[in-house]
Amino acid sequence: MLQTAEAPWSQAETQSAHALFRKAYQRELDGLLATVQAQASQITQIDDLWKLHDFLSAKRHEIDGKYDDRQSVIIFVFAQLLKEGLVQAEELTFLAADKQSKIKALARL
Amino acid sequence: MLQTAEAPWSQAETQSAHALFRKAYQRELDGLLATVQAQASQITQIDDLWKLHDFLSAKRHEIDGKYDDRQSVIIFVFAQLLKEGLVQAEELTFLAADKQSKIKALARL
């Protein structure tokens, strides 16, 4: 993965980034849980149960890999979360302007 | 797997065996679906969602391997189904007595 060349991270930025990270993670899990419960309650065919199983397998794999909090990649993770609506642009204002711009630009790719 | 040495299978036995097989399979799937729906509706923690995922993975694997309808193994499969309560002894009366006895004996192992 490309390294970002933004300004060094302050301690406040790092702490707030981790807090927002956890928030997005919780939102994702809450959403997944709601989706699974809604889908499970509507299943009548076994094929749909296996489809739900496939969906869960894929999501678990995706979520396991997604929340990488190494500082070298966190800009990319936030861009992805912004793209997916798990983080809102207004929540990124604790970051220096160059980081916010970079995240927004990446999210549009 | 051991071969069974019971009397040859009549056409009627084979047909009824396959019908009972499908019935047991449907019972298993119905039971699994009910279990998953009940569990899913009670989940509040993500760990429990992953546990449900693990449970489904194991069940899918088990069910995929279990309903082996080759005549050489069907006695063993019925023994397993009997043991698990997916087939009742009274449902096996279409089979010659030696086959019923063998299934019941294997189910007690």
Curated annotation (Swiss-Prot), chains A, B:
Primary site of residence: membrane
GO cellular component: plasma membrane-derived thylakoid membrane
Bridged cysteine pairs (disulfide): none
A Pfam family annotated for this UniProt entry: FRP
Effect upon mutating residue 53 to L: About 50% conversion of OCP-R to OCP-O
Top-level lineage group: Bacteria
Keywords, sorted A to Z: Membrane, Thylakoid
Record keyword Isomerase present: no
Record protein name field: Fluorescence recovery protein
Gene transcribed to yield this protein: frp
